[in-house]
Every structure is written in C-alpha cells, then in structure tokens.
A protein has these predicted regions:
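Solvent-exposed coil/turn segments that connect beta secondary-structure elements
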Residues: 45-48, 55-56, 67-70, 78-81, ...
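Flexible, acidic/glycine-enriched loop-and-adjacent beta/alpha segments
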Residues: 63-115, 171
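Extracellular/periplasmic catalytic domains that process cell-envelope and extracellular macromolecules
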Residues: 33-36, 42-43, 66-70, 147-149, ...
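N-terminal post-signal-peptidase region of extra-cytosolic proteins
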Residues: 24-29, 55-64, 78
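Alpha-helical membrane-targeting segments
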Residues: 21-25, 82, 87, 91-106, ...
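Generic structural signal for well-ordered beta-strand positions
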Residues: 50-51, 230
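Non-catalytic, structured segments within soluble enzyme domains
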Residues: 107-273
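N-terminal type II signal-anchor transmembrane helix
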Residues: 1-45, 50, 102
C-alpha cells in the first residue's frame, strides 16, 4: 500500500496533468486541424497541368469515400487489426510495451500503438520516446475516438502519415512513386505503399526497395490470413512487379512569367471577395 501511495504522489499528478492537456487539445481540434496546406495544381483550358505549388510538404487531401479500399485493408491488417474493435487503445499492446519499458530500464523499445495513437502522435505530438509522450498519446487516442468516427480517423491518418521522400498522405505517395491517383492503385501497390510508414527510412522505396517489397509481402499475407482478400487475389498481388518512378526534378527558376501571372490573377480574385 505504501508503494502505491508513493507511486501516486510521484507520477499521479503528472499523469492527471497529461490527461488534462490531452483532453484540451482534442476538444479544440476540428476537421481542419488534420488538413495541412495542400499542394495546388493549375491547369490550362484543355485540362493540361501548367504549374504545381507546394510548400515544404507535398500534400493532397482525400475524403474517406475517395480512399482506396485496398489501402484501408492493408493499413489495418498490418498496423491495427483490431481497429474497429477498440476505443483508441489496444491494452494488450500497451501491456507488452510496458513490460518492455521495465525490462529495458526506462527505454521505450515497443510501440503498441493503434492507428488512433499514431494519428495523435503525428498531428499533435513529437517523436520523442518518453513515458510522458506515450501517456499523453494514449489519452489523446481515447478522446479522438470519442469525438470522431472510425471513418474520420482513417481519413485523417491516411492524409497525414509520412511515406518518405517528402510525401505526406496516400495521394501524394501514389503520385510521387507511381504517377497515378490513389484510386487507381493496384492491390499490390497499395500494400507496397502501406509498408512505408512503419519506418520511412528502412522502407524507403527508392533507396531500400527490397525491404519495402518484403514488408509488402508480409502485408499481403496478413490480408489473406485475415480473410480480407481471396487466395487468387493474394497470389496475383504478390507476384506483381512493382515499378517505382524516379523523383521528379524541380524547376531551378523561382518563378517564370506564367507562374507570376497566375499568382497575380489569384490575388486579384481574393481581394474582390
């Protein structure tokens, strides 16, 4: 009992503070919180792309109904197979992470994170592996599940997760690696892209493609074993050759006359409103 009392006075107040901060952050959030500044594309009258404006991130936002079914199935199968059953936290996973924390003397070596926790970490928190960040992440995941639907959480996650090489979100990754919209991805390509976020360096498609392929194969196997796809679909997808496009070269000139004119016209229209 004495140890419990000492433990509460040592960590209890800190935990309650983290819970309060987590609740406040989620309460203040809205759908716009999960929408980064998007990449803008300018087309001519014939529908041909003229220009693409982007900041530090290459970002496109897709609504839930626009997300490919294969991508959703792939990410759930490998990252959070109990996604539709939990309320933000997988307590078995947390228990494993807690045991690992004790065994490794205060170092966090296992995540045990659900997709909702990963969303909280990506949008609201830093990447530091400390117990405070982990506790806050857990509280935020619970609050996110109270405020948003499972479909919204998937939408937010797949539009914010990092796919290496400056691509944030599934649409940017699909365009960057395959030069196609996410809706046109094959099952194999969807699984391939879903392999990246776990570790964007190790599974970088351009520098470590073999690693990405191995994880793609694991994801496809998980999808088959979880009865998300048929055997013939699995066999076709695992034998499909993945062809990754090279990075597009950015223009060296800052602004040509077309870009300057587009910005000028857009500014005039905004000023009228």
């Amino acid at each position: 009992l004495l140890l419990v009392v000492i433990g509460w006075f040592t960590f209890g107040a800190k935990v309650m503070k983290l819970r309060s901060e987590a609740k406040k952050l989620v309460a203040q959030s809205s759908e716009d919180t999960f929408k980064a500044s998007q990449t803008s594309i300018v087309y001519d009258t014939n529908g041909k792309q003229l220009l693409k404006f982007k900041g530090e991130k290459d970002v496109y936002y897709l609504k839930y109904k626009e997300l490919p079914v294969y991508v959703i199935a792939a990410v759930i199968s490998v990252e959070d197979k109990n996604f539709y059953k939990h309320s933000g936290v997988d307590y078995k996973g947390i228990s494993r992470a807690a045991v690992s924390y004790v065994v490794h003397k205060g170092r966090i070596t296992q995540g045990g994170s659900t997709l909702t926790q990963q969303l909280a970490k990506t949008v609201f928190l830093n990447r530091q592996k400390t117990w405070k960040r982990k506790v806050k992440e857990i509280f935020m995941a619970v609050e996110l599940e109270k405020k948003y639907s499972k479909e919204q959480i998937l939408e937010f996650y797949l539009n914010n997760v990092y796919y290496a090489n400056g691509y944030y979100g599934i649409q940017a990754a699909s365009q960057g690696y395959f030069r196609k919209d996410a809706k046109n991805l094959t099952m194999s390509e969807a699984a391939f892209l879903s392999a990246i976020p776990n570790n964007p360096t190790i599974y970088d498609p351009r520098t470590n493609k073999e690693n990405t392929i191995k994880r793609r194969n694991k994801i496809l196997k998980d999808m088959y074993e979880q009865k998300l796809i048929r055997k013939d679909q699995y066999e076709e997808a695992i034998n499909e050759e993945i062809k990754v496009k090279n990075a597009q070269k950015s223009k060296t000139e800052k602004k040509n006359y077309v870009e300057t004119y587009v910005i000028h016209c857009a500014t005039k229209e905004i000023m009228k409103q």
